[in-house]
Amino acid sequence: MDIKGTTRVCGLIGNPVGHSVSPAIHNNLAQLTGKDMVYTTFKVEKGDVASAVRGAYSLNILGLNVTVPHKSEVIDSLVDIDPLAKAIGAVNTLVRVDGGFKGYNTDILGLARELEYEGIELADSKVIILGAGGAARAITFLCSSKNAQCVYLLNRTVDKAEVIAQAVNAHFNNDKVIPMNIADYADIPGEDYVVIQTTSVGLHPNDEAVVIDDEAFYKKAAVGVDIIYNPAKTKFMKLIKAQGKNAYNGLKMLLYQGVSAYELWNDCKITKEEADEVYKCLQKELGINE
C-alpha cells in the first residue's frame, strides 16, 4: 500500500474496533480499483461522537463507517440523512458533503445486495425474522420497503417486536409486519418463507446453539439467511439445509455493506467479480472455509 500526501482517508468509529474486518474490505477494494485511499479504525468512546465527527470533517476525512455503540448517537452530528436510515434510527456510513457528513444505512443495502445476488426476491415474499434488535429493525424496514407480502417478527420479548412492528407499519402505512412471541412459531401459517436469523444465538464459540430447535419450524422455510458469519455454518443454517433448502451466512452481507459504503465515498460501482475477489480475501483473513 503506497500512502502519499494525496491519499484520502476513510475509517471506522466505534468501541471496540480492534476486531473489525472493515480495513480488509476497503483496503482490498482500493487496491483492486486503483483508488488512492486508505482505511483504518478509530476507537471512539461513548459521548465523544460529536467531537469525533467534527474532527473528521476538519481533517478532510472522506468518509466513515460507524459501529456499536454509536449508530444512533451519530445521527445528531449529521448535516443530512438518508430517509430510510432516518426511519430505521441507525446510521453506519457517513459520506462527506458540504459542511459535514450525510448518513446512510448500508447494512440494509448489504443484505439487499446479498439476497439479489443469491436470487432471493423479497417483493411479494413471505418473511420470518428471528430477533428484535437493531439488525432486525433494519431488516424489517428493508423487507417492507421491498414490498414483502408479510413479515412475522419473532422474539422472546414480544414487546420489542411490537415496537418495531408499530414503527415499520406506521412508516409504510400498512399492517404487514406481525409481532409474535417466538414460542408461538407454530401458529405461523403455511410454508415457503424467507427466514432471516438476526440474533447472536449460534455465534462462536456457541456453535450448536439455535433460537428454535424444532424441525417442524424449518419446514416453513424456502431459504434461510443467518447474519452470523462465525461459524460459517451455524446450527440454524444446518437445520435449513436438512430440509433440502439453501442457507447463507452473514459474511456477504458484511462485505456488501462495505462495498455500498465504498461506492458512496468514491462515486463508483463495484462489479460482482471485484466483490468476489474481496470475499476470498475475507475468507482467508477469517480462516473461513465454506
Where in the sequence are the language-model features?
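Phosphate/diphosphate ligand-binding glycine-rich loop within oxidoreductases
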Residues: 2-118
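Residues at the starts of beta-strands that form the adenosine-phosphate
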Residues: 9, 38, 126, 149-151, ...
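Glycine-rich adenosine-cofactor-binding loop
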Residues: 14, 105, 124-145, 155-160
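Short beta->alpha hinge that forms the Motif I/post-I loop of the SAM-binding pocket
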Residues: 44, 156-160, 232, 250
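Short helix-loop-beta connector
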Residues: 120-126, 218-220
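NAD(P)-binding Rossmann-fold cofactor-contacting core
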Residues: 146-172
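Rossmann-like adenosine-cofactor binding region
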Residues: 175-247
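Adenosine-phosphate binding glycine-rich loop
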Residues: 223, 227-290
